[in-house]
Amino acid sequence: MYMKNLKTALITGANQGIGFETARELGVMGFTVLLGARNEDRGKKAEEVLLKEGINARFVLLDVTKKDSINKAVALVDKDYGSLDILINNAGIAVEKGRQPSQLEIEDLKETFETNFFGLFEVTKGFLPLLIKSTAGRIVNVSSGRGSFANNTKPVDKSLNALAYNSSKAAVNMLTLTFSKELEGTKIKINSAAPGYTITALNDFKGHRTVEQAANIIIKLATLDENGPSGGFFDENGNVPWWKYK
């Protein structure tokens, strides 16, 4: 099932949480992992930890909200590696902190979309030429079950009624679907992953799943063989419904 010829994977937001664990597991599998992070000190510390574990890791300065930063990261990967085999768009933020839609300001939505959607789009577009050079490029967009209209129709705690975050993840899923249609006929596969409510800084460590559990579906989608799906939305149990709740 795992592809043997993949060599280089770039993970955004890789200095902590799900991104760091995903990088670690791909590194254990033998990939060179490029740790995209906007904070240099944290990025280098993450690199140091993985290097001590025997993983071929490298910090790459990458702020997904800054086009110049993305361009420099693309140029670095192009110069030093020539192609990219796996792109994992993991960087994300949540600003609600329990606030309901009417309690948000427009700036909250703009800030959320800047990282979760616009940044993800720019990173994907920027690295696409290098992914095309791969023998089988894989893109995994770390979404959320909250990006499913179906899941949002279920009775949930009001703290999960997060307009900015949920909307941004729904937009990510549409990006996944539309890019998959554009990339039909190529060797690239792109999918969205729902890692579940995980114990990370994103939710002030209030989740109930470990980063190891969360990384499972991301790793699976990142290492799909040529018969794997593209344009889908998956969690550890399989397909996540886009909109219709049964």
Where are these regions (language model features)?
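A glycine-rich helix->loop->beta "capping" turn
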Residues: E53-N56, L76-N89, V95-K97, E105
